[in-house]
Amino acid sequence: MAAINIVKKRTKPFKRHQSDLFKRVGESWRKPRGIDSCVRRRFRGTISMPKIGYGNNKKTRYCMPNGLKAFLVRNVSDVELLLMHNKTYAAEIASNVSARKRVEIVEKARALGVKVTNAGAKVRSQE
């Protein structure tokens, strides 16, 4: 089977209408509901609204550029879950894991052939 190219239909975030004009209006998206709203009525030249057409391909959704999906790992036993799925998932160590446990997780992943996306994070070299 041929590999499917990962295509993101939109990478820019959808901004809230008039968030560039007023400081009190945040940038996070809100659906316009006013009866005279130009954005809701989809006038030409206004910002675009999120809709179903911007969705990505189901087979490549949530994929990283290397083609793997991230799986959050909090302990060594979570790495063992990826043993049979190391071609589709990559381990990503959670941010609240200590440096000592990180070393154990990375060693276990290397033994099982599981890729770790943030293997070098928070791990200091022996001085």
Swiss-Prot record:
<dbReference type="GO" id="GO:0005829">
    <property type="term" value="C:cytosol"/>
</dbReference>
<comment type="function">
    <text>Component of the ribosome, a large ribonucleoprotein complex responsible for the synthesis of proteins in the cell. The small ribosomal subunit (SSU) binds messenger RNAs (mRNAs) and translates the encoded message by selecting cognate aminoacyl-transfer RNA (tRNA) molecules. The large subunit (LSU) contains the ribosomal catalytic site termed the peptidyl transferase center (PTC), which catalyzes the formation of peptide bonds, thereby polymerizing the amino acids delivered by tRNAs into a polypeptide chain.</text>
</comment>
<dbReference type="Pfam" id="PF01655">
    <property type="entry name" value="Ribosomal_L32e"/>
</dbReference>
<keyword id="KW-0689">Ribosomal protein</keyword>
<keyword id="KW-0539">Nucleus</keyword>
<protein>
    <recommendedName>
        <fullName>Large ribosomal subunit protein eL32B</fullName>
    </recommendedName>
</protein>
<dbReference type="GO" id="GO:0022625">
    <property type="term" value="C:cytosolic large ribosomal subunit"/>
</dbReference>
<dbReference type="GO" id="GO:0030684">
    <property type="term" value="C:preribosome"/>
</dbReference>
<keyword id="KW-0963">Cytoplasm</keyword>
<dbReference type="GO" id="GO:0003735">
    <property type="term" value="F:structural constituent of ribosome"/>
</dbReference>
<dbReference type="InterPro" id="IPR018263">
    <property type="entry name" value="Ribosomal_eL32_CS"/>
</dbReference>
<dbReference type="GO" id="GO:0002181">
    <property type="term" value="P:cytoplasmic translation"/>
</dbReference>
<comment type="subunit">
    <text>Component of the large ribosomal subunit (LSU). Mature yeast ribosomes consist of a small (40S) and a large (60S) subunit. The 40S small subunit contains 1 molecule of ribosomal RNA (18S rRNA) and at least 33 different proteins. The large 60S subunit contains 3 rRNA molecules (25S, 5.8S and 5S rRNA) and at least 46 different proteins.</text>
</comment>
<dbReference type="InterPro" id="IPR001515">
    <property type="entry name" value="Ribosomal_eL32"/>
</dbReference>
<dbReference type="GO" id="GO:0005730">
    <property type="term" value="C:nucleolus"/>
</dbReference>
<keyword id="KW-0687">Ribonucleoprotein</keyword>
<comment type="similarity">
    <text>Belongs to the eukaryotic ribosomal protein eL32 family.</text>
</comment>
<dbReference type="InterPro" id="IPR036351">
    <property type="entry name" value="Ribosomal_eL32_sf"/>
</dbReference>
